[in-house]
Amino acid sequence: MGYTNSPLVAYTKLSPNHSGQRTHSIDRITPHCVVGQLSAESICGCFISTERQASCNYGIGTDGRVSLCVEEKNRSWCTSSRENDQRAITIECASDKSEPYAMNSKVYASLISLCVDICQRNGKKKLLWFGDKNKTLNYTPAADEMVLSVHRWFANKSCPGAWLYSRLGDLAKQVTEKLGGSTTVESTPEVTTDGNDKTIWNFLKGKGLNDFAIAGIMGNIYAESGFKPTNL
């Protein structure tokens, strides 16, 4: 099938920073935190200079509007991994500037809608989140499956931040439900209270841990233990 771009796009400013047409079919989605409450236009603007050596396929501004920075047919430079970017649609999402890099409800709702659209146009009925790097990277998706991956697996970063990382199970669940599919993969528990996220973060920070270490701990708590902040 030919490559298309999302009809949800409200603004287009194409970046010169890409590798041309993909060498792998699209079977991953990689959401990122852009580290700033930026507009859809500003996210594209971040990737216009060739000196930046970075880009993404889509941006989601702080008001929930979607921008197109690199067409889906082309590999963006977003995840510090050639292999991942060749097969992933990369999405930079407006966020706070510091951990847990929280995103507002408009951004999250648009991320869900954009993921649904990407899956539909690429013939996918399920969006999967395993919460495990090795399992994800060694998994061969079925023809109707799309898989979530994250930037932190390929670089010394916390991206997409503890806020979104803890919600990727919920993202996969909501998208799959809207696609009419089903999944047996366990979802990461949804974290519903931002204040509790920050309480845990500040507690661990007070123990002398750095931001990257705290992000990893919080992600593991939510993804693997089944706990929610309200239970801790």
PLM regions with names:
Residues 116-123, 209, 222-226:
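Hydrophobic/aromatic-lined pockets within catalytic cores
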Residues 31-36, 60-63, 69-73, 92-96, ...:
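Active-site-proximal beta-strand/loop segments in catalytic clefts of secreted hydrolases
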Residues 28, 88, 147-149:
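Structural preference for beta-strand elements that scaffold enzyme active sites
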Residues 58, 91, 111:
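Divalent metal-coordination and catalytic microenvironments
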Residues 211-232:
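Catalytic glycan-binding domains that act on GlcNAc-containing polysaccharides
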Residues 1-85, 188, 196-206:
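N-terminal catalytic cores of peptidoglycan-degrading enzymes
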Residues 2-12, 18-23, 97-190:
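Basic/polar, cationic surfaces and motifs that engage anionic cell-wall
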